[in-house]
Amino acid sequence: MKRLIPLLLAAATLCGCRPAVSDYAIVAGPGIADDPAWSEVVAALRQSHPGAALLSYTEAPDEALPALRELAPRYVAFVDRPEQIGRDYIIALNRMARAVDGDSYDDYLWGVVTGYNAAAARRMVEAAREPLTVRSAVSTLREVGCGKWFDAFAYVDDRTPGLCGEKRPGADSVTHYMTTRTLADGRPDLLRCFCDFYAAYDPDLITTASHATERNLEMPFSVGNLRARDGALYADFPEGPEPLHETGKRRVFLPIGNCLIGNVNRTRESMAVAWMNSAHAAAMMGYVVPTWYGRNGWGGLKYWLTTPGRYTLAEAFYLNRQDMLHWLDYRG
């Protein structure tokens, strides 16, 4: 199974609901409880979820597993500094989620709360007390190019170089066209198109594909990059870097077709942390391994988009994983 990182807030914070006492557990990483700033992140979570159980670990997250088996929570939030979070950490959390009882399915909805610093992590927790309804999107996916789920939408196509589309507020459908923006070598300037769409539509949702690493996000056909520096995203244009235009609104970032971009890589200078910090991503799902075709990502997106309003983002990805696990069990 391809590993996907459910970053930021655990499922209940995205639901806009308050689970019953003991339905929510918080697992604090090494030194979190003793750090005045990071302990405030935990306190903010407990304020959002009264009665939440508080657990901790010192060496490995699975130290909390015996207590989780006893509590049997429905939601678990792991609070850690970026320097603690990497590929192996996420793999361990995926395995833990299936280890509370004896079957092969996930036993709780979970996510990671982190940030460029403690203040950024706390800001996300506090902002998530109000549910986020997605009405607008910017994308680099042909798969969502019809834009039918959104009131406003724009995309850069990842199969036909230079093809773009826009659905302006009030329009019934997407208008497709070939961009006239070009680079000095004649290739379409897809990075400029994407950044202009981002600024103009101020999207609630961003979905992306094409190459990526922990340090960059390529536009389709390798025409330009978004990069991270000092916890902020910028466009790496030939004429010089430009910060990605931000308004401070919360967003959802789903790099469904990108390798590695979900891997925090044990540093706060990663792309994942920059999306949380400067782009105010309130929810993010991303791969921590080299893949662009995993069912964990594409399937979760399909569960969420094809039943609009039925599931929260966290619920959609959770249900997709259970579907995958059932299929794997069935195939033996």
Place the predicted regions along the sequence by residue:
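Sec-dependent signal peptide recognition
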Residues: 2-8
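Bacterial Sec-dependent signal peptides at the C-terminal "C-region" and cleavage site
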Residues: 9-22
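Cysteine-dependent hydrolase recognition
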Residues: 20-332
